[in-house]
Amino acid sequence: MNGQNIRIRLKAFDHRILDTSTREIVNTAKRTGAQVRGPIPLPTRIEKFTVNRSPHVDKKSREQFEMRTHKRLLDIVDPTPQTVDALMKLDLAAGVDVEIKL
């Protein structure tokens, strides 16, 4: 697989789970002899929701909730076939969305 790069994008709501999953991928790739660029932290997406506290009156009384989506980017340069096999067998934590581009 000479001349190819594997780009991995990870997304999660909890940054601790995201960082441990990223570390697992980096350690697996380095163990199999591939060069890793990253992890590169991408901007966190913050969605805010504003709702009324009471069901029908008191428009001035509101509550805000937010949902944060943390993202990381990894590039694996010139992966070996062993690297690809190891990454396919890797079991990551639940709650981590993985996108892989070749």
Swiss-Prot record:
InterPro entries: Ribosomal_uS10 (IPR001848), Ribosomal_uS10_CS (IPR018268), Ribosomal_uS10_dom (IPR027486), Ribosomal_uS10_dom_sf (IPR036838). GO terms for molecular function: structural constituent of ribosome; tRNA binding. It holds the Pfam family Ribosomal_S10. It comes from the Bacteria. GO terms for biological process: translation. Keywords: Ribonucleoprotein, Ribosomal protein. Coiled coil: none annotated. SUPFAM superfamilies: Ribosomal protein S10. GO terms for cellular component: ribonucleoprotein complex; ribosome. Transmembrane segments: none annotated. Involved in the binding of tRNA to the ribosomes. Part of the 30S ribosomal subunit. Belongs to the universal ribosomal protein uS10 family. This is Small ribosomal subunit protein uS10. The lineage of its organism: Bacteria, Pseudomonadati, Pseudomonadota, Alphaproteobacteria, Hyphomicrobiales. The gene is rpsJ.
